[in-house]
Design a protein with these regions (language model features):
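Alpha-helical, coiled-coil/dimerization segments enriched in small aliphatic residues
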Residues: 53-60, 65-68, 171-197
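Flexible loop/hinge segments that line or gate small-molecule binding clefts
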Residues: 98-126
Length: 268
């Protein structure tokens, strides 16, 4: 009887071992693009992460946190090999990959193209829920809101107008997160047409905005011959640049867009 009891105890212990291992296994999170990388790194730093190849590029806000992390291409083969529990994406991954992931029961979080800070809050909550990190999500929203309070103009302060311009010669009007960033810092957007649009060198010369907010000029290898870098544009903007926002602050509809607003405020 004593031997039978020992055998039964060993059998129960062995049977329970895989279940315990499964419960303690780190969450496996795969990101399909650079924006997904930011959310995965911020909300699930303790997870087993498979990040996109662009996770540590100069225009990645969380590039330092990405150091030493696994990188994979956003392919079906990579997903099959990694076996993620959750996939985070903004635009990455083709229809075939997404269909196969969902068929396998993988949770796929698609970040919305947020055009204001309420939309960013929605992205954070959706990603935090899928990544089982609601507390981290709340902390991230609180951090963003604190930055927005820092950026907010004094009550009654007049709004100054400014033109947002990238090195590639693009600007942004209403219905974009850039417009929300300008507004959060108390700046009135000179562009009234919605969405993103190119701005010609000739128009800038004739228009001669009183203030410029420049962005994506820190990417020395990107758009190095773009209209925004034209000598005539440089002369038009001389002495009129409110701030130069780093590309990393505006590459993704995420919480660090509030840092861009705070930079504008700090630049005066």
């Amino acid at each position: 009887m004593r031997l039978s009891a020992i055998v039964l105890a060993l059998a129960l212990t062995t049977a329970g071992a895989p279940a315990v291992a499964a419960e303690t296994r780190p969450l496996r999170v795969m990101s399909l693009d650079q924006c997904g990388d930011q959310y995965a790194l911020a909300l699930a730093p303790g997870a087993a992460l498979a990040l996109s190849p662009r996770a540590d590029d100069p225009d990645s806000w969380m590039r330092e946190a990405a150091a030493g992390r696994r990188r994979v291409r956003p392919t079906l083969e990579a997903a099959v090999g990694f076996r993620p529990d959750v996939v985070v994406r903004y635009w990455g991954g083709d229809a075939r990959l997404l269909a196969r992931l969902e068929a396998r029961g993988v949770r796929v979080v698609t970040l919305a193209d947020a055009t204001d800070f309420d939309g960013v809050r929605g992205n954070i909550r959706a990603a935090a829920l899928a990544l089982e990190a609601p507390g981290r999500g709340d902390a991230l929203i609180a951090r963003m809101d604190a930055r927005l309070r820092q950026a907010a103009p004094a009550t009654g302060a007049p709004k100054r107008s400014a033109l947002y311009l990238t090195a590639g010669g693009f600007t942004a009007g209403p219905g974009t997160l850039v417009d929300a960033v300008l507004g959060a810092a108390g700046l009135a957007n000179l562009v009234r047409a919605p969405g993103f649009a190119p701005v010609s060198v000739e128009r800038i010369v004739l228009w001669r905005p009183a203030r410029f907010v420049l962005s994506f000029f820190d990417q020395s290898r990107g758009d190095w011959r773009g209209p925004g870098r034209h000598p005539v544009v440089r002369r038009a903007a001389k002495g009129r640049v409110v701030a130069r926002l780093p590309a990393a602050s505006l590459t993704c509809p995420a919480w660090f867009a509030a840092d861009a607003a705070s930079m504008l405020k700090a630049a005066g």
